[in-house]
Each structure stands twice: as C-alpha cells, then as structure tokens.
Amino acid sequence: MPSDTRILIVDDHEDTLYALESALAPLGHRIGRATSGDEALKQVLRGGVGLLLLDVCMPGLGGLEVVRYMRRVEQTQHIPVILLTGFGVDHALATTAFRLGVADLLLKPVDPWSLRTKVRYLYDAHRRHLALEREVRRLRALAREHPGTPAHPASPVLPHPGAHVPTQRPQGAHAGELEKDRG
C-alpha cells in the first residue's frame, strides 16, 4: 500500500474524532478525518484511504449510505469499513451492515486496545490485498509481453491432492492391545 494511504475516521462530533485519533496514534499510520458522510465519500473517491472508521448516524449522508455507494464503485469496493454507533446494535443494523461487507460494527465509546487490534489487522490485510493485485497485474503484463514463455517456471512435481497417502501403520496394528486395554 502506498505510504500516503491513510485511515479515515468519520464522525460529526469533534470529541469522538479526537478520541479515535488518540486511540489509533500508537499504530503510527497516517490518519485523516471527515465530519460528514459527504466529505468522507469525496476523500475516499480521491484515493489514498486504506481503512474507514465510519459513524452510522450523521446529518446528511449516513454511514450505511456511504458504504452502499462505496460498494458500487470498483476503486472503493474493497476498502475495509468499521462502522461505529452510539445507539446500540440492533438486528436490522447488523444485518444490513454485514450484507454490505462491513468488517465490523462497534459501539461507542470504543475500547482503544480492541480498536487498535482490529484496525491493525484490517489495514494490513487490505495492504496485502493491494500488493497481490499489483503483482497479478505485473505478471499479466509480463505474460502479454512474452506470450511464448511458460506461465510457470520449472518446479518440482507434487503428487495430486487426491493421490493415495499410505497410512502411518499397517491396518490392525495394535488393535489387539487396544481391545485388551478396554476389557
């Protein structure tokens, strides 16, 4: 993931933004902020966002609407999103959020240690996903440049996964001893 990629935190309350920034500061990642869904969507569409912490209820465009839009746009559909709510999690909210591909749904105030753990995991997973996509594009470009070369370099031949694997011991070995122990 490019070094200019950041975590974007979105909430309409300044004190919540400050608390989230403070909780995430030990991770050492760049952090951006937005105070509305509209502003968040603009930043996400400009690029450079590797993870989004997004409040569910905000004036104007709410968190779920932002996620719905992001999932329809190819460049933003794989950005991990953690939704935050201060009103509790009901079944309808959780169902909608997870159907949209939200990574997690957390209650405010958020436990800083738990938040850092989840953010570290999701941010790193997204960074690895992007690196794999870049590598696939690079390999496809190489394959187009050199169409006559084999796709895979010579490598040791491994047995087919369905091949018979011998058992560790002959059938029936120690069976008499097992029967004797049971009696």
What residue ranges belong to the model's regions?
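Two-component/phosphorelay signaling modules centered on CheY-like receiver
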Residues: P2-R6, E14-G32
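Active-site residues of response regulator receiver
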Residues: D11, D55, T85
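Short amphipathic alpha-helix used as the core "switch/output" element in two-component signaling
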Residues: K42-Q43, L64-Q77
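Active-site beta3 strand of CheY-like receiver
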Residues: G48-L54
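Alpha4 helix (beta4-alpha4-beta5 surface) of REC/receiver domains from two-component response regulators
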Residues: E65, Q77, G88-D104
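A Lys-centered signature of the CheY-like receiver
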Residues: L106-K108
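C-terminal output helix
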Residues: V110-V119, Y123, R127
